[in-house]
Regions:
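Start-transfer (signal-anchor) and selected internal transmembrane alpha helices
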Residues: 1-13
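Interfacial juxtamembrane loops and adjacent helix segments
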Residues: 30-106
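Juxtamembrane segments of multi-pass membrane glycosylation machinery
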Residues: 109, 116-134
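Membrane-interface micro-motifs in multi-pass membrane enzymes
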Residues: 111-112, 164-198, 202-206, 223-225
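Hydrophobic, membrane-inserted alpha-helices
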Residues: 115-118, 139-144, 161-169, 210-217
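Transmembrane-helix motifs of polytopic, lipid-linked glycan transferases
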Residues: 135-156
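Membrane-interfacial loop-to-transmembrane alpha-helix junctions, especially the N-terminal start
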Residues: 150-160, 199-211
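Membrane-interface alpha helices of multi-pass inner-membrane proteins
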Residues: 206-226
Length: 226
């Protein structure tokens, strides 16, 4: 039901906002700066999946309604058998009214819950600004976890949580639409446990708590199978 509602949002402004920054977000070859950090960043970024997520957010077939879009998740690609999401998104942005040279696919095996926030955000901001906004949210959540852990005299939790982050390609997680979803959910879960550990432990609610976290991860994370 929620996906149907977001598919009722106008895609015109979303497409224009994506077009503003698609060149900056999908650099290749000579477009990548020569410094070592930029080369590392662009070589390891999850642009393949991010491009699919963004294009899913701005797709709209004139002969399909919101329910059909939410159910089947239509997606145009330049290739019929091998997906080329970065090039396909660029081509789609250049001429989204003319898709005669593209192949229509369906991507129905995932929940695509990320569209609940990605579509409204792209309605208001460019793709680049959405990434910066997610970066700010992640930094704010990490600071919140650190402060709460110190106040609860449980600094070890903060140390372990933030320490583990260093082993997860931290820079890439912070600027990736794909990777940031699980990290944000993890930080929210840790924060909730810090605030409500006694109640969760005394009432034996941890199994249900982790079940809810798993459900949310499966729903919002693009790469988690239902």
């Amino acid at each position: 039901m929620l996906l149907i509602l977001v598919f009722l949002l106008p895609v015109g402004p979303m497409r224009r906002n994506v077009e503003k920054s698609v060149g900056d977000m999908l650099k290749t070859g000579d477009e990548i700066p020569e410094d070592a950090f930029s080369k590392y960043l662009w070589k390891n970024r999850e642009t393949y999946t991010d491009a699919i997520m963004v294009q899913n957010a701005i797709e709209r077939l004139p002969d399909k309604n919101a329910y059909e879009h939410a159910m089947w998740m239509y997606h145009y690609d330049l290739e019929e058998d091998v997906w080329t999401p970065e090039d396909s998104l660029k081509a789609f942005c250049e001429s989204h009214e003319n898709v005669n040279d593209m192949y229509l696919h369906i991507y129905a095996r995932y929940w695509h819950g990320y569209l609940l926030y990605l579509k409204p955000l792209l309605l208001l901001f460019s793709w680049k600004h959405v990434v910066w906004l997610e970066l700010a949210v992640q930094i704010a959540l990490m600071i919140w976890v650190l402060i709460t852990a110190i106040r609860k005299q449980n600094a070890g939790v903060a140390a372990v949580t933030l320490g583990s982050f260093l082993f997860m390609k931290p820079v890439l997680v912070l600027i990736s639409l794909t990777m940031s979803v699980c990290w944000i959910l993890t930080l929210l879960a840790v924060e909730y446990m810090l605030l409500h550990h006694d109640r969760l432990h005394e009432k034996g609610q941890y199994p249900e708590f982790f079940l809810i976290i798993g459900i949310l991860t499966s729903y919002f994370d693009f790469l988690t199978y239902p």
